[in-house]
From Swiss-Prot:
GO terms for cellular component: plasma membrane. Part of the MsrPQ system that repairs oxidized periplasmic proteins containing methionine sulfoxide residues (Met-O), using respiratory chain electrons. Thus protects these proteins from oxidative-stress damage caused by reactive species of oxygen and chlorine generated by the host defense mechanisms. MsrPQ is essential for the maintenance of envelope integrity under bleach stress, rescuing a wide series of structurally unrelated periplasmic proteins from methionine oxidation. The chain crosses the membrane at residues 8-28, 82-102, 116-136, 149-169, 171-191. Belongs to the MsrQ family. It is found in: Cell inner membrane. The lineage of its organism: Bacteria, Pseudomonadati, Pseudomonadota, Gammaproteobacteria, Enterobacterales. Coiled coil: none annotated. This is Protein-methionine-sulfoxide reductase heme-binding subunit MsrQ. It comes from the Bacteria. The keyword Iron applies. It is a multi-pass membrane protein. Heterodimer of a catalytic subunit (MsrP) and a heme-binding subunit (MsrQ). Binds 1 FMN per subunit.
Amino acid sequence: MRLTAKQITWLKVILHLAGLLPFIWLFWAASQGYFSADPAKDIQHFTGRMALKFLLASLLISPLARYAKQPLLIRTRRLLGLWCFAWATLHLTSYALLELGINNLALLGSELISRPYLTLGIVSWVILFALTLTSTQYAQRKLGRRWQFLHNFVYLVAILTPIHYLWSVKILSPQPVIYALLALGLLAWRYKKFRQWWR
């Protein structure tokens, strides 16, 4: 049975809660001293993982809609992308304020350039920023064919962000590897699409 427009609306509500409730938990956990001896790192990793989860979820929508024969699922993709950007912005902000400190924000530019894993992160954020700005139907009409070209850069983000995560951890653990494999799998599903571009 195919999902109805009303069911998609309720699904969007659930997805909004999935994006908002972790933020409420994060605020509570930080206020209660829930994190380790290095809470700044914990918060950075948490916000980064949330951004990556929403990115992977947005990439999952197309194959899921196709194989489950639920075309209306595509309507949730933009919402997932917006939450990805929101959490990515929190991730960047947490690094700037908690790692560098408000008195050292002038160092942010040099830090992003001098540390390769940070460079990958900021490139991904800039792409997500551009995709967010042009995610409306109005932007799609204005850009025409260029809109699809621009939004194909989400696949570059799907490559860069798992590398950024793997590179940022001092001790390799299963979690970043799992995210990298999931991203690789979602990109591999689009293999034929990529081949058409390269011809």
